[in-house]
Amino acid sequence: MRLTNTHDISLENTIQGIKLAYPSLKQVSGIFGFIDRNFNDEHIPLISGGGAGHDPAHWGFVGPGMLSASITGELFEPPTPEEIITVTKKTTTLKKAFYIVKNFPKD
């Protein structure tokens, strides 16, 4: 008996569901990253992330007065440095950001 999709399909289904349920979030194209559409670039962004499979962390905390953006890696894997940089560049034009991103070995 199979209870879940393959992890690739499961992540894509999650992204599609988030986009439909939370129009205040903008997906970063090509990766599992979300930005608060109302983020004001005059402020230093707070960006958090970790591995997929712990939803709604971290995208569930993106919004006014909370996270500016989130980045999620593959299933039970932290996001890559390249993914973190991509989300940062899409979030702000400032040369600074505050990060809370978990780094751990793959499960």
Model-predicted segments: where are they?
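Short glycine-rich or small-residue beta-strand-to-loop segments that form or flank ligand, phosphate
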Residues: 44-51, 67-70, 96-105
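Structural signal for hydrophobic packing residues in well-ordered secondary-structure cores
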Residues: 14-26, 88, 92, 101, ...
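Glycine-rich oxoanion-binding loops at beta->alpha junctions
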Residues: 54, 58-94
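Short, functional N-terminal and low-complexity linear motifs
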Residues: 31-34, 51-56
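Conserved active-site and cofactor/substrate-binding residues in soluble primary-metabolism enzymes
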Residues: 6-13, 41, 53, 57, ...
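Phenylalanine-focused residue identity feature
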Residues: 32-34, 39, 61, 76, ...
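N-terminal amphipathic/basic leader segments beginning at the initiator methionine
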Residues: 1-46
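Small-side-chain structural scaffolding
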Residues: 14-17, 45-49, 63, 69-70, ...
